[in-house]
């Protein structure tokens, strides 16, 4: 039997009951990748030999009834900006082509402790800069629901692989929507946890005050299980939060009667397509039928999210990416005749167009004479956006709206128009700016392309988001659609 579309929960049950061996699961997954990924192009690197070896070691533990770990024998795919010891980590960039880390990221250590099995590294926008996975130096990933459409980005490979049944779960990173937007486009579940919930140690930095690692799965409960496994304070990350409550599954089945949900009028305003508005309005009616109270509210500074985000994120990126100088590691220009030339040529040849655009933008925003007008002002706007959310959360438990203003666009449609591409982040960037948790769950389709519903919660209240998402999923899901892709 093929297990490629089974849930983590079901696979765990089969393994615990000894109906299937971890090595059978892993081999089945590689067979699926061999069959499907030449078309989808979600993986950048596979770790097949080590994965099968690890799975066979787990077979022996299974035979002895020593099945420790929440994710015992469960295959996983990891976005290629998350450090994996002894497995190439490129950030989908020429700059890091061939870079093999000598240490492990915290999330990978946690997943290894739970006995999950690394299948391979997943494609992404270069250095997580992009919303379509088209800025990858190596390949363009396709949307499993429609091969003429992008999978979203920057975690496009992570979302596409899960939707196509190539792994039961993946990890992505979310700086301004990079987990939630591709989850929306690919019809899967993507969670951006509260800033500080998951350690960033071993995540190649894009914008350090915004980046957060999170899980992508085909259902809500699986997502909660993975977040339980990777959450927690870490001495290696001073921004990780000492929050003890990492139980997201015990209350997941509780009803949502009486829960107060806010629908910001700005989230169904200008720029949001009619089909997305219709699906979200239907989803709101579903939430009401489940017993939730939904009211319209205002988040007046929403429209300033994109300009504020792109100034702050680009500024932090220009500082973070200064470390790629062609000397210590990464691409090294062979033509340079001097130290200055080495810096210039290594960076101009090693980085792609979108990365260079954001470095230029960030360096300009931080430069003398412009710092106050751009960076400082953007930080003030960030505070206003956070204050808007704080005010709403005084009276409401959850904020609801679309994840993205449209369904997935066509490959090649927006890659030469950065402003149009950036506009897709309208509804996701405010969540990062405020440091809040946000989850995308499927809520509809238009012309075969999925639509995502975004649920936004109070800081460190992922538990409530999972409850609402789980109840909604009982009324609408794409579980039967995946196998027909």
Curated annotation (Swiss-Prot):
PROSITE patterns: AMIDASES
Domain of life: Bacteria
EC number: 6.3.5.7
Active site: 79 (charge relay system), 154 (charge relay system), 178 (acyl-ester intermediate)
GO biological process, one term: translation
Keyword Ligase tagged: yes
Assembly: Heterotrimer of A, B and C subunits.
General function of this protein: Allows the formation of correctly charged Gln-tRNA(Gln) through the transamidation of misacylated Glu-tRNA(Gln) in organisms which lack glutaminyl-tRNA synthetase. The reaction takes place in the presence of glutamine and ATP through an activated gamma-phospho-Glu-tRNA(Gln).
Protein name: Glutamyl-tRNA(Gln) amidotransferase subunit A
Origin species: Staphylococcus epidermidis (strain ATCC 12228 / FDA PCI 1200)
């Amino acid at each position: 039997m093929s297990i490629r579309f089974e849930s983590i929960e079901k696979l765990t049950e089969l393994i615990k009951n000894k109906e299937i061996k971890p090595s059978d699961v892993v081999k089945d997954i590689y067979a699926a990748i061999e069959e499907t990924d030449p078309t989808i192009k979600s993986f950048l690197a596979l770790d097949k030999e080590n994965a099968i070896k690890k799975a066979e070691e787990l077979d022996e533990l299974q035979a002895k009834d020593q099945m420790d770990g929440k994710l015992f024998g469960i295959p996983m795919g990891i976005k290629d900006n998350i450090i994996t010891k002894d497995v190439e980590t490129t950030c989908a960039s020429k700059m890091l082509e061939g870079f093999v880390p000598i240490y492990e990221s915290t999330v990978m250590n946690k997943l290894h402790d739970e006995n999950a099995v690394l299948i391979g590294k997943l494609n992404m926008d270069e250095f997580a800069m992009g919303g379509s996975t088209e800025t990858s130096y190596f390949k363009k990933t396709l949307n499993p629901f429609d091969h003429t459409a992008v999978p979203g980005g920057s975690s496009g490979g992570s979302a596409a692989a899960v939707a196509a049944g190539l792994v039961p779960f993946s990890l992505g990173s979310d700086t301004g929507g990079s987990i939630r937007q591709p989850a929306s486009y690919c019809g899967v579940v993507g969670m951006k946890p509260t800033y500080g919930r998951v350690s960033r140690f071993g995540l190649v930095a894009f914008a350090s005050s915004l980046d957060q690692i999170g899980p992508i799965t085909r259902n809500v409960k699986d997502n909660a299980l993975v977040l339980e496994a990777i959450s927690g304070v870490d001495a290696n990350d001073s921004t990780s939060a000492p929050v003890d409550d990492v139980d997201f599954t015990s209350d997941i089945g509780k009803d949502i009667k009486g829960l107060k949900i806010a629908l910001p009028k700005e989230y169904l305003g200008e720029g949001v397509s009619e089909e997305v508005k219709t699906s979200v309005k239907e989803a709101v009616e579903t939430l009401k039928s489940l017993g939730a109270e939904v009211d319209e509210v205002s988040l007046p500074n929403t429209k300033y999210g994109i300009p504020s985000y792109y100034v702050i994120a680009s500024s932090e990126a220009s500082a973070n990416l200064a470390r790629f100088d062609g000397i210590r590691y990464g691409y090294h220009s062979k033509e340079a005749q001097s130290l200055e030339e080495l810096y210039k040529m290594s960076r101009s040849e090693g980085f792609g167009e979108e990365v260079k655009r954001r470095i230029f933008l960030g360096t300009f925003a931080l430069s003398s004479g412009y710092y106050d007008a751009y960076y400082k002002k953007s930080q003030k706007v960030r505070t206003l956006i956070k204050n808007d959310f704080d005010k709403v959360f005084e009276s409401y438990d959850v904020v609801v709206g679309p994840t993205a203003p449209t369904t997935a666009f066509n490959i090649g449609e927006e890659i030469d128009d950065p402003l149009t591409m950036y506009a897709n982040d309208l509804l996701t960037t405010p969540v990062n700016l405020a440091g809040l948790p946000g989850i995308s769950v499927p809520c509809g389709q238009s012309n075969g392309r999925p639509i995502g519903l975004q649920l936004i919660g109070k800081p460190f209240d992922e538990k409530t988001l999972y409850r609402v998402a789980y109840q909604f999923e009982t009324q609408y899901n794409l579980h039967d659609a995946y196998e027909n892709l």
